[in-house]
Regions:
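Glycine-rich, Arg-bearing micro-motifs that act as flexible, cationic patches
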Residues: 100-125, 139-140
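Short, hinge-like loop/turn segments at secondary-structure boundaries
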Residues: 49-52, 95-97, 119-120
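Structural beta-alpha unit
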Residues: 67-101, 138-140
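Short, flexible loop segments at boundaries between secondary-structure elements
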Residues: 130-140
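Short glycine/serine/threonine/alanine-rich loop segments
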Residues: 29-30, 74, 98, 129
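A short acidic, glycine-rich active-site loop
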Residues: 49-61
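Small/aliphatic-rich secondary-structure junction motif
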Residues: 1-47, 52, 77
Length: 140
């Protein structure tokens, strides 16, 4: 089993990382750090540019999470996925036998999340795994 974390370096994602590390360590499970972003198109230069940006930006984000996981002594797998974050997380939850999916929130209103389809909101409705939504810290 594993703890699947959606990570993008936002304040909410950083808070979610701390919770996911705690859960993985307490349960003796592997942490799967997922960075997913949807491609703008499926052909040509636009798709190639997207893949390059995914590897660069997503790779940097994942490396930061991986460093924290290693410092905490948690076995970690990383996944860069060219798909909408919700789809990426559900796909990786299935692939890695998730016990829970952990995501951060960024303080949006529930109505805005429902209308715009935020990742946490959509996961709560689509996931067959438990979803832990961790709020971003309050601004100082």
């Amino acid at each position: 089993m594993s703890v699947v974390l959606g990570f993008d370096e936002s304040p909410g994602a950083r808070a979610a990382l701390a919770s996911a590390l705690w859960l993985a360590k307490a349960a003796g499970e592997r942490l799967v750090v997922v960075y997913g972003t949807a491609p703008p198109g499926s052909m040509g230069e636009e798709a190639r540019t997207h893949e390059a940006v995914l590897r660069q930006v997503g790779g940097t984000a994942i490396q930061h999470a991986l460093a924290e996981a290693e410092a905490a002594g948690v076995e970690t797998v990383t996944e860069l996925v060219s798909a909408r974050p919700v789809d990426a997380l559900l796909e990786q939850a299935e692939a890695h036998d998730a016990s829970v999916i952990v995501v951060g929130t960024w303080g949006e209103s529930p109505m805005r999340g429902a209308i715009l389809g935020s990742t946490p909101h959509r996961l709560l409705h689509l996931s067959r795994w438990p979803v832990l939504c961790v709020p971003a810290p309050a601004p100082a």
